[in-house]
Structures are given as C-alpha cells and as structure tokens.
Amino acid sequence: MLLDLSEEHKEHLAFLPQVDTAVVAEFGRIAVEFLRRGSNPKIYEGAARKLNVSSDTIQHGVEGLTYLLTESSKLMISELDFQDSVFVLGFSEELNKLLLQLYLDNRKEIRTILNELAPRLPSYHSLEWRLDVQLASRSLRQQIKPAVTIKLHLDQNGDHSTHFLQTDPATLLHLVQQLEQALEEMKTNHCRRVVRSIK
C-alpha cells in the first residue's frame, strides 16, 4: 500500500534534500518528540538560526516528516512500499535510505504513542431490558403503544456507567436490523482490509 501524500505535504518535505543527512536525522528525532510532547517553537528557532532559514520552513519540514512517519506507522506499510512512497518525492538514494531507517527505527514507538493518544471509548458490560405495556384503561381512545426500556451498563477505563434508554419496538427492530447489516458488512473484503490496516 503506497502513501498518498498531498501537494502540501510534498512541499513541506521538499526542504529535506537541501540539508545534510545529519540534519534530517535530527529532524526525525524532533518529529518523534513532537508526537510525544507537542510542538516546541524554541527548537524550530534554534534550527532556523543554524541553517539560515525561517522557523516556519523548519516547522513545516518537521511536520511533513511527522506526517510521513505517522501515516506509514499507522498503516504498517512494508519497507518496499515505504521506499516506493518516498521515491515519488524525487529524493536522492542516500536520503531515501535515511528516511527508511528513520521509519524502521521509530515505527513501533510511533504506534505506541498513537495508541496512547487514541480516545478510550466506552465498552459494553451488560444490558437489562423491560417491556412496558398498558394493560387496561377506562378511557382508551388510541392504540396501545408498548415501550421497551433498556438499562445499558458500560465500562470506560475501569469506571462503570449506566444509561437508561426507552424506545418503541418498531424503532428497536429497525436499530437491530441496521446493526446486523453493519456486522454483515464487516465480513466484506474491503472492511477486512481496512481493519487490517488499522491494527
């Protein structure tokens, strides 16, 4: 799977061939630090003074490299696919090898950082339900509409939460059909490829 880099990212990465390979390696270290701790303008300003360029150019170069490394790590692309993705940028062979080495050295750490940054969504714990129906009424002028009351228990980071939901059976049936359709769709080849690339 090849990376699809936008023109903006290609422009940001176009600065890399203009500097020494040691500087590109340092940019790689800064890119990983950027993921860990966020942006640090002082680092950009110091590098800009040393290289006699604007700090925006340095920042864009680091951000472009960060994007290249994070997307490659997220998709777990192979060495060959990474080389092909970078080859499109028209860099020298030495720079391509350096970028590949940066990717191989940092991909596990980047995936760990991305997993830590991912939101922790609530997970299902248990479910209780009750069907409420009015059995009799002296002045019943409309059709009886039963209601389904659901008590949903969720876990999120060890915390338990309870949510009460109430709906009519027709809506619940529609919801069940939609969920079953989504589960069937997960069995398609396209969805399997997407899930594989996310892992």
Swiss-Prot record:
The keyword Cell membrane does not apply. Keywords: Cytoplasm, Transcription, Transcription regulation, Ubl conjugation pathway. Transmembrane segments: none annotated. It is found in: Cytoplasm. It comes from the Eukaryota. One of its GO terms (cellular component) is cytoplasm. Residues 123-190 form the COMM domain. Belongs to the COMM domain-containing protein 2 family. Component of the commander complex consisting of the CCC subcomplex and the retriever subcomplex. Component of the CCC (COMMD/CCDC22/CCDC93) subcomplex consisting of COMMD1, COMMD2, COMMD3, COMMD4, COMMD5, COMMD6, COMMD7, COMMD8, COMMD9, COMMD10, CCDC22 and CCDC93; within the complex forms a heterodimer with COMMD3. Interacts with RELA, RELB, NFKB1/p105, NFKB2/p100. Interacts with CCDC22, CCDC93, SCNN1B, CUL3, CUL4B, CUL5, CUL7. Scaffold protein in the commander complex that is essential for endosomal recycling of transmembrane cargos; the commander complex is composed of the CCC subcomplex and the retriever subcomplex. May modulate activity of cullin-RING E3 ubiquitin ligase (CRL) complexes. May down-regulate activation of NF-kappa-B. This is COMM domain-containing protein 2.
